[in-house]
Amino acid sequence: MSEQNNNEMAFQIQRIYTKDVSFEAPNAPKFFQQEWQPEIKLDLDTASSQLAEDTYEVVLRVTVTATLGEDTAFLCEVQQAGIFTISGIDGTQMAHCFGAYCPNILFPYARECITSQVSRGTFPQLNLAPVNFDALFMNYLQQQADGAGSQPAQEA
């Protein structure tokens, strides 16, 4: 019974913080006088590292690029990070925690930071929809399974 208690899954948020923020409006004020119908591109990436036994940093990088025609109106990148205590899981469950569960926690903070930066750049309000990191993680696993025997690993 005591072995079972030692192997129970534990998850705790230690800290959530903004690691890096960048906002660029390379063609301002050109776009302030045009009709605002940009193409918005959203890029997401995650990284994790072990800080101590059962303590991990997970970083969610969110990049939003708004373009009108060929020109970039703005580019905003936020690295939202968290320090988490995670124990009692491994393998695919740990990968899911790093690739989906923690990013689901971090994304609302990153979204708020991006919205604030875009507003400070005096661009119209940007509302980013929630992201289903669980579905993205499942797609990633499926791609890994599909390509495991037929292709060498590719850099993202």
Swiss-Prot record:
Which one Pfam family would you cite for this protein?
SecB
Q: What does this protein do?
A: One of the proteins required for the normal export of preproteins out of the cell cytoplasm. It is a molecular chaperone that binds to a subset of precursor proteins, maintaining them in a translocation-competent state. It also specifically binds to its receptor SecA.
Lineage summary = Bacteria, Pseudomonadati, Pseudomonadota, Gammaproteobacteria, Enterobacterales
User: What is the originating organism of this protein?
Assistant: Sodalis glossinidius (strain morsitans)
This protein's gene is called: secB
- Localization terms from the record: Cytoplasm
| GO molecular function per UniProt | unfolded protein binding
Q: Which UniProt keywords apply?
A: Chaperone, Cytoplasm, Protein transport, Translocation, Transport
What is the designated name of this protein? Protein-export protein SecB
Homology family = Belongs to the SecB family.
Q: Which InterPro entries match?
A: SecB (IPR003708), SecB-like_sf (IPR035958)
Question: Subunit structure of this entry?
Answer: Homotetramer, a dimer of dimers. One homotetramer interacts with 1 SecA dimer.
Q: Among its keywords, does the record have Nucleotide-binding? A: no
The Gene Ontology biological process terms listed for this entry are:
protein folding; protein tetramerization; protein transport
A GO CC annotation given for this chain: cytoplasm
- Superkingdom, natural source: Bacteria
